[in-house]
């Protein structure tokens, strides 16, 4: 209500996005406001398939798990500790966009 010209929401996770979409519907603006989430959970993919949410961004969850385990092993085995003042290592993890055009590939 305080931002009537709002065109889109990008949410940090799909649970938030599904709630935002519900609020958008309750405001009667589902044809005017785009909602995109993150995580590609089953309910969000169904929402995308049904033309409700515009998209969801999924990640390589196995890759995230492997990277976390490797860091944990390094911490235990080598005594590695994060130095808050040092530049932290970056691990890039693949992501993918699920839209109405490709949602069936991810269901």
Label each residue range with its predicted role.
Residues 50-62:
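Short beta-strand elements at the ligand-binding edges of bilobed clamshell
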Residues 2, 23-27, 47, 51, ...:
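Structured segments of extracytoplasmic/periplasmic soluble domains
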Residues 63, 67-107:
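Hinge/cleft segment of the Venus flytrap/periplasmic-binding protein
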Residues 14, 59-62, 66:
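Electropositive phosphate-/nucleotide-binding environments in soluble metabolic enzymes
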Residues 39, 60, 101:
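Residues at the C-termini of beta-strands that transition into short coil/loop
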Residues 1-46:
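Hydrophobic alpha-helical
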Residues 5, 32, 52-53, 94:
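A generic structural signal for alpha->beta connector loops
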